[in-house]
């Protein structure tokens, strides 16, 4: 299954001018069968999907609940949580990475760095946590290897 793991939608993020229905249509045209909504520090985009579209439209397309979490010491981290798990704490930025990893794993979620080699202040490899303990990378479940908003040498 081909899934876009890092999606911002206008219903939940100022980082997007594309609504979720248009996004799904574009992804389908490019051969994707799913997406993870990962708006910054909010589940509002996913909530919109769940309330207005889930089970009504695009039933052949998988939409997963995610968030792009802004850590205190490790840049942006993509977090994917199971459908039934409610964690409002993830909508409050600033948790240290080690605590975030423990919290997500204890509640059945997975996580990994977003654009890990990209922008200086938002990327894991430029963050304090990586320099202090690079072995923490072993605790990630995945690593984003391509981000269309980053320059070629960052991917």
PLM region spans:
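Distinct, well-ordered alpha-helical segments
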Residues: 49-51, 76, 119-136, 155
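Short, structured patches in soluble enzyme cores that scaffold and shape functional sites
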Residues: 81, 113-115, 147
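Conserved beta-strand positions in the central sheet of alpha/beta enzyme cores
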Residues: 36-37, 112-113, 144
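Internal catalytic-core helix/loop-beta-alpha segment
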Residues: 93-128
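Catalytic pocket-lining loop regions of alpha/beta-barrel enzymes
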Residues: 109-110, 128-149
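A metal-dependent hydrolase metal-coordination microenvironment
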Residues: 1-106, 150-155
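Short acidic, S/G/P-rich loop/turn micro-motifs used as interaction or catalytic elements
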Residues: 118-119, 148-151
């Amino acid at each position: 299954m081909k899934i876009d793991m890092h999606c911002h939608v206008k219903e939940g993020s100022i980082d997007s001018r594309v609504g979720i229905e248009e996004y799904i249509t574009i992804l389908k045209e490019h051969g994707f069968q799913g997406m993870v909504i990962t708006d910054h520090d909010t589940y509002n985009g996913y909530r919109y999907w769940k309330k207005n579209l889930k089970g009504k439209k695009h039933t052949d397309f998988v939409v997963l609940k995610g968030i792009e979490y802004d850590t205190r010491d490790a840049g942006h981290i993509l977090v994917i949580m199971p459908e039934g798990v409610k964690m409002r704490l993830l909508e409050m930025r600033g948790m240290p990475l080690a605590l975030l990893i423990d919290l997500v794993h204890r509640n059945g979620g997975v996580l990994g760095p977003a654009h890990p080699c990209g922008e200086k202040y938002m990327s894991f490899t430029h963050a304090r946590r990586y320099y202090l303990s690079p072995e923490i990378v072993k605790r990630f479940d995945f690593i984003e290897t391509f981000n269309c908003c980053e320059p070629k040498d960052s991917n």
